[in-house]
Amino acid sequence: MSYTKDDIHNLVLKQREFFLTGITLDVNFRIQQLKRLKEMMLNNSARIEKALYDDLGRSDAEAYFCDIGSVVMEINEYIKGVKKWNKPENHGSGLACFPSTKTKVYKLPYGVSLIISPFNFPFLLSVGVLAASIAGGNTALIKASSKSKASTEVLKQLIADTFPPEYCVVIDGGHDIADFCLEERVDKIFYTGSPNVGKHVMEMASKNLTPVTLELGGETGNWAIVRKDANLKDAARKIAFFKIMNAGQVCININQVAVASEVADQFIEELKTAYIKQIGENPLENDEYPKLIAQRAYDNIEKEAEEYRDRIVFGGKGNKETWKYAPTVIYPVNIDEPIVNHEIFGPLLPVVRFEDAEINQLMDVIARREHGLALYVFTKDKKWAKKVMSTQQYGGGCINEVCLHLMVKGVPFNGTGHSGMGAYHGIWGFREFTHPSSVLFGHTHFNLPLREHPYNKKKKKLLGAFLK
């Protein structure tokens, strides 16, 4: 379907009218919708897996793990927690507000939310965000990616079969349709994608002063640091697994590895072994190995690989017909080269060497670049690891592990700086789609004349006693 500007405007009007009925304020209504959303995902897993294979070449197992099971876990958390989270907070008003003794903080929905989702996890990053919006009591327009055509079509059909359009609807189309949505006066915008488009979203949102959440990849990518005392086999195995996932098209994926020079060659050999063990000698013929999303994405990866052809120590092959490009290790790479100064979003893995004794200099270089969405460190030195993870600027990460911080219940998923703003998952998602409203309960039969005109020295003295 091709949308006009009027079509989008009318959808927003209908959703606002639905919101103003007050139906979504009922927490039991929200829980019912979340349960319907969960059933939608579970009852249509085969259709979802097929769409993800068509778009991204994902295996059934990877599709279920990344875009179905993880979404269901997220929805379960909202179903279980939303009643508790939505309860008003009780606060004492304090002596300065006497005779009032009671103040409540209500958690109120914004209204009409706009969710703009990317191609790489078309269900996780649309339905997962939708669950947060529903839990918060909003209506939702989902602008799904035009790149993941099969997934967007399935998502559009499933949402249409599950919810009325005045409550939740999926809109497909390109950047022009996204701009139609952004021009509308919605009440909350949640965007997942690149920093450049994130800036455009913020600029458009500023015209209506619409609050925005941005989940971005970060302009200089996510680092993995491998110290000389790390378990190299374990680190290589986990890094290879993660780079294979979705052919590297993951916002929290490892963009580049910095490995201690003392163990760099050994680490490279372990990395090669891990890749071969997991996806074989020829991943281009392995049906479990995903593909890139489009010809343009393939061409960009192929072009960048060719620029570093003389330093490719593993991989470096692709298939233009299937858009598959093998996991490719580029080594050694200087920390100032272009490939480690932008987000690759693909299966290329540049490896930088550093002297382990000069780890602080490395971390200083990383700290001066744009903040990544994730950071991963591999070391036996837990004290150092904790210090780094508690002082660097990044979204989230792991010590001696990859990506699993995303699966932990009750903790936020977020970026900082050029990797985003705002947080979601569980209670953090509920908070992101609600705003607090503080209400003081006054008295009608007893007032304090102290605050009223005319003022005198006695009143000022008493005010001083109250307000200190």
Give the ranges of each region predicted by the language model.
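N-terminal Rossmann-like NAD(P)+-binding subdomain of aldehyde/semialdehyde dehydrogenases
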Residues: 1-103
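ALDH superfamily catalytic-core signature
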Residues: 2, 163, 196-335, 356-360, ...
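Structural signal for hydrophobic packing residues in well-ordered secondary-structure cores
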Residues: 19, 23, 38-41, 45, ...
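Residue-level signal for inorganic ion chemistry
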Residues: 30, 75, 137, 168, ...
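Short gly/ser/thr-rich secondary-structure transition/capping motifs
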Residues: 91-99, 170-173, 238-239, 311-313, ...
